[in-house]
């Protein structure tokens, strides 16, 4: 059996730091303003990549009914990181996000799960694009952090299919941020 390829988190961080270093310049070409790409945001996203890498390595299926809550963990990680003190600080927001995630009848996880199950046998590209659009479309799946969480869930799907993850880079930043604005 071939050993599972793991993410090079240092390479992911390098790519993100390149974007961060030129974010002000890049954002001049975005169709709508974006929040600053701070060190905290960057490090939380890297922790998110470590998390999805672990899920893939352990063979976890995020779209199994028993595992859907792990998408909330990805979202919490991009917002707060893995630090327990930050999780306590944001406990009310995380609880509100969980309620929104499970109880939103117009979008929510039920809609995403049903869509994914209906298209499970389609190409990975169609599934990844459909999942991303459903996460970002109104009503968005999470209260905050939908772009970052969505790109990590897409990366997870790509990695499970043996493909490289999506990583924000200088080459794809404009293409990533502008369609994300239109989807919402």
Feature roles, as predicted:
Residues 1-184:
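FIC/Doc superfamily catalytic core
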């Amino acid at each position: 059996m071939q050993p599972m390829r793991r993410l090079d988190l240092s390479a992911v961080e390098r790519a993100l730091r390149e974007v961060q270093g030129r974010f002000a310049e890049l954002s001049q070409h975005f169709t709508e303003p974006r929040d600053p790409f701070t060190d905290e945001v960057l490090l939380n996203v890297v922790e998110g990549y470590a998390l999805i890498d672990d899920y893939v390595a352990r063979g976890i299926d995020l779209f199994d009914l028993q595992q859907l809550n792990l998408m909330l963990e990805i979202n919490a990680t991009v917002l707060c990181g893995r630090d327990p003190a930050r999780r306590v600080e944001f406990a009310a927001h995380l609880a509100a996000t969980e309620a929104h995630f499970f109880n939103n009848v117009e979008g929510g996880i039920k809609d995403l799960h049903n869509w994914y199950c209906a298209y499970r046998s389609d190409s990975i590209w169609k599934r990844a694009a459909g999942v991303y659009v459903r996460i970002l479309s109104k009503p968005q799946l999470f209260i905050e952090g939908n772009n970052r969480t969505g790109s990590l869930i897409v990366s997870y799907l790509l990695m499970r299919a043996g493909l490289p993850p999506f990583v924000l880079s200088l080459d794809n930043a404009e293409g990533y941020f502008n369609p994300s604005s239109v989807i919402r």
